Design a protein with these regions (language model features):
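Bacterial Sec-dependent N-terminal signal peptides
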Residues: 1-24
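Structural preference for beta-rich elements and adjacent junctions enriched in aromatics
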Residues: 16-240
Length: 240
């Protein structure tokens, strides 16, 4: 009995240590030699610069075990952030438009804290490029939505097009890109990303899909699904 307890404790601590190790590993964000202005050209740009994909693969809550294939890659050009998502899942939907409940659709999210003031931004984008962007310290009433003119600054491309559609219960692979200028951080006065270190997390979700799921890049230790947990953000290091 004692031996069995010891073995169980050993493997539990090993798993915890592995998670802790992944949390403590900063992600280097390469500084690109070239840039593009159209979001549809981001995949080719990142291919040319050999920017690797990183998996969004943490299943944090046992009540939601479904794990679609989800990856992201990120780079910057001093005043621009380039993000490329690649997803394969069993069903998709895209009912929300800009400023709407995109998290109920097939959705990828980028939460980032650009300074040490506790304020973070949530860039939530569904599979047709509809964007929800807010800033604040907590969630709900503590957050402020971005004005429409700020949303328009974030250039987007989606492989599934831009037209809304209802639930499709069929295996689907889709891609999404964003070009985020520093002006999109509308509560801050950023001019350059080079050399900066920021806290962030990436998510894949689908609250209204046939297989509800909540994946993250960095693990989250809360009893219930909650992406607004900046204490569990990982580290992004923007290369000079």
């Amino acid at each position: 009995m004692i031996l069995a307890t010891f073995i169980a404790l050993f493997f539990s601590l090993s798993a915890y240590t592995d998670i802790q190790g992944r949390e403590d590993q900063p992600l280097s964000v390469p500084h690109l030699k070239k840039s593009v202005m159209e979001a549809k050209n981001v995949p080719a740009l990142l291919d040319a610069e050999d920017v690797p994909f990183t998996t969004i693969g943490c299943v944090n809550w046992s009540a939601y075990p479904y794990k679609p294939e989800a990856q992201f890659r990120i780079a910057h050009a001093d005043s621009l952030i380039f993000i490329h998502y690649r997803v394969s899942e069993e069903c998709v939907a895209a009912l929300a438009t800009d400023g709407g409940a995109v998290f109920k659709d097939a959705c990828c999210e980028f939460f980032i804290m650009p300074a040490d003031d506790g304020i973070y931004y949530n860039f939530e984008t569904n599979c047709i490029g509809s964007l929800l962007l807010e800033e604040g310290i907590g969630k709900g009433a503590l957050r402020s939505a971005a004005p429409k003119q700020v949303l328009s600054l974030v250039r987007r491309w989606a492989s599934l097009g831009t037209q809304t559609f209802s639930l499709r219960q069929e295996p689907t692979t889709w891609e999404l890109t964003l070009i985020i200028p520093v002006e999109a951080f509308f509560h801050h006065q950023l001019t350059s990303l080079s050399g900066r270190t920021m806290r962030a997390n990436f998510y894949k979700c689908g609250n209204g899909l046939c297989q509800r799921h909540y994946l993250s890049w960095q693990p989250i230790r809360t009893p219930n699904p909650d992406f607004h947990q900046s204490a569990y953000f990982g580290t992004l290091m923007y290369q000079p």
